[in-house]
């Protein structure tokens, strides 16, 4: 049996930009992508802490070191600049993989700077 498990999470990311006219996606600072082992064009689930919205899109690379979290296209309707997001990726795993698996959690602070990286 396969289970869909949390693979990585950027916790309390702050939206820095929202561009309704862009063709879609979520731009994420490359440093944050590396820290969470997330990849460009990977599907992500986003949870808006401020308003409870839940939505999905895909990743595009943001400028390294910028702290960028930009919502583009339809996703820009789901959050405002300054809103806090939880950004997650999931992966299918079999029972053997699940037994000893720990997701990668990246806790963010002001300016989307990394406060802590942990496996829960």
Curated annotation (Swiss-Prot):
The modification Pyruvic acid (Ser) is found at residue 25. Its cofactor is pyruvate. Binds 1 pyruvoyl group covalently per subunit. GO terms for cellular component: cytosol. It catalyses: L-aspartate + H(+) = beta-alanine + CO2. Keywords: Autocatalytic cleavage, Cytoplasm, Decarboxylase, Lyase, Pantothenate biosynthesis, Pyruvate, Schiff base, Zymogen. It is an enzyme of class 4 (lyase). This is Aspartate 1-decarboxylase. The lineage of its organism: Bacteria, Pseudomonadati, Pseudomonadota, Betaproteobacteria, Burkholderiales.
